[in-house]
A protein has these predicted regions:
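A glycine-rich helix->loop->beta "capping" turn
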Residues: 86-99, 105
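Conserved glycine-rich cofactor-binding loop
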Residues: 31-32
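Active-site helix of classical SDR
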Residues: 132, 168
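Residue(s) in the substrate-gating loop at a strand-loop-helix junction
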Residues: 152
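C-terminal beta-strand-loop-alpha-helix "lid" module of Rossmann-like NAD(P)-dependent dehydrogenases
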Residues: 185-235
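The beta1-alpha1 cofactor-binding region of Rossmann-like NAD(H)/NADP(H)-dependent oxidoreductases
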Residues: 72-82, 114-115
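Substrate-binding pocket helix/loop in short-chain dehydrogenase/reductase
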Residues: 108-109, 116-118
Length: 295
């Protein structure tokens, strides 16, 4: 009988060992940056790795390392179900899920079209949640598994003109906390990774989205300041390479008891600490200055 994403195999559960060289991993958003490096890291640890993205042409370079490309659109339920079914049919298991697919769409709350805000939630939140729904029944049956949600320090603090993006990441943090509690009795670890400044395409893509909202906007000066900070090479040269996130994922999947959260990358820990201890208005001033706001 064909195994489906909604129904785990009927075979007797086999516990997953966290020793390197065992298991099957699925990484979304694997065509570049954090996802690509994470797929390579898991492969180096001995996993059978499926790297998923909407466009498989951008995944072909992964095949040289033995990574299996998987066409998957996290906004399309049929696409996700088909991808999960393929993995289960080929391997009979999914031991690690890395929910990495996502993007940042910046702009003033007033300016961003509500359809774009919805799309960002579809990719960053509902896609993550639905893929998790498809895989957790299988992990529960096996009595083990690791779900790693790539969030952001943007799920712990807010930057100018990023309200819609930050709302998606705050949602990921909350969903992850609930999942961790719900899935713990079944032997499934749920871990959040919160990248700080990482040297990927993310900032330039977010700046493109932001600048698209500038024409005729009452927030044009703020848009110019924030987009400039995002594109600044003087900022980017301090950013951490995406390998730091991949190495963190490697630590998580081999740890007997991984931490619930890992803040990693340029300024991740200091900014989260500052948000925790500073009053709201003091933090507003700090983060505004970092983005070059003129008052």
């Amino acid at each position: 009988m064909t195994t489906t994403a909604e129904q785990a195999p009927a075979a007797a559960p086999q516990a997953f060992s966290k020793a390197p060289g065992t298991g099957v991993a699925l990484v979304t958003g694997a065509s570049s940056g954090i996802g690509e490096d994470t797929a390579h890291k898991l492969r180096a640890l001995g996993y059978i790795v499926y790297g998923a993205a909407r466009r498989t042409d951008r995944l072909q370079a992964l095949t040289a390392d033995g990574i299996r490309p998987l066409a998957m659109d996290v906004t399309d339920d049929a696409s996700m179900s088909s991808g999960v079914n393929r993995i289960l049919e080929e391997t009979g298991r999914i031991d690690v899920l890395v929910n990495n697919a996502g993007y940042g769409s910046y702009g003033a709350i007033e300016d961003v079209p509500i359809d774009e805000a919805r799309r960002q939630f579809e990719v960053n939140v509902f896609g993550l949640a639905r893929l998790t729904q498809l895989i957790t029944p299988h992990m529960r049956t096996r009595g083990s598994g690791t779900i790693i949600n790539i969030s952001s320090i943007g799920g712990r603090l807010t930057t100018p003109l990023g309200g819609w993006y930050h709302a998606t990441k705050y949602a990921v943090e909350a969903l992850s906390d609930a999942l961790r509690i719900e899935l713990s009795p079944f032997g499934i670890d749920v871990v959040v990774v919160e990248p700080g400044g990482i040297r990927t395409e993310w900032a330039s893509i977010a700046a493109d989205h932001l600048e698209a909202t500038a024409e005729g906007s009452a927030y044009a000066d703020q848009i110019r300041d924030v987009a400039g900070a995002m594109r600044s090479e003087s900022n980017r040269r301090h950013y951490s390479p995406p390998e730091v996130i991949a190495r963190t994922v490697g630590k998580i999947v081999t740890a007997r008891h991984p931490r619930t959260r890992y803040a990693v990358g340029f300024m991740a820990k200091p900014l989260i600490a500052a948000r925790r201890v500073l009053p709201d208005r003091a933090f507003d001033q700090l983060i505004g200055a970092a983005f070059g706001f003129r008052r």
